[in-house]
Regions:
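Catalytic adenosine-cofactor/nucleotide-binding cores of aminoacyl-tRNA synthetases and other
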Residues: 78-209
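Active-site cores that bind ATP or allylic diphosphates and position pyrophosphate for catalysis
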Residues: 1-99, 106
Length: 209
């Protein structure tokens, strides 16, 4: 079964980050295979509707698929969610970050290397979003997730692919480590000492989740 796309259909849509987007005319996409199994495009639309998804936030490589999904919502008589297409992260040489080749593309790598979750969240926020602006007009790069979410504005997200600057992450991590209370710092340090064989009896990183 194919989705018949009318030649005169309106294919522009509003992206929360990029504003009005003019997408290329899609082909008559297969939405149901011969064996009755739905393809991704039909499955994701129905699944998002059934789960009550209000915002679809995904990488910019999916922009060309959005008109297909919006047409399916319309044909099925469903209310579409809002769409936001994030810029793709880049290495320092501006090449695309590979999930297979770059260890930093895996969250577990940051845990194993000793990066604090608070520092990583702060760093990721800064990749596509400007620093916090204080009442005196100054910028502040160190902020909590609560502060970030309270001030978040889609219109401020940078649509240009940001550079994954490890030096900035290392600096932020140092800031957060120095702010830890002694007890908290010790609790976070013990698993690394255990894994290194320096101490015995301390919980491992895996046991701490």
């Amino acid at each position: 079964v194919r989705m018949l796309v009318p030649e005169d259909v309106e294919l522009r849509f509003t992206d929360l980050i990029r504003g009005e987007v003019n997408a290329p005319h899609p082909d008559d996409q297969v939405i149901l295979k011969a064996d009755g199994f739905p393809t991704y495009h039909l499955a994701v639309v129905v699944d998002d509707h059934e789960m009550g998804i209000t915002h679809v936030v995904r990488g910019e490589e999916w922009i060309s698929s959005t008109p297909k999904h919006l047409l399916l919502y319309r044909m099925l008589g469903l209310t579409p969610p809002a769409f936001a297409h994030m810029p793709l992260l880049r290495n320092e040489d501006k090449s695309k970050i590979s999930k297979r080749k770059n260890p930093a593309a895996r969250l577990t790598w940051f845990q194993q290397e000793g990066y604090l979750p608070e520092a990583l969240v702060n760093f990721l926020a800064l990749l596509a979003y400007p620093p916090m602006t204080e009442t005196d007009g100054s910028d502040r790069e160190v902020f909590t997730f609560g502060e970030f979410s309270d001030r978040f504005d889609w219109s401020k997200v940078n649509p240009v692919g940001p550079i994954f600057d490890m030096k900035k992450l290392q600096w932020l991590n140092g800031v957060y480590i120095r702010e830890l209370e002694v007890g908290d710092f010790t609790a976070r340090l013990l698993p690394f000492l255990e894994d290194a064989g320096v101490l015995s009896g301390a919980p491992s990183l895996g046991e701490l989740g």
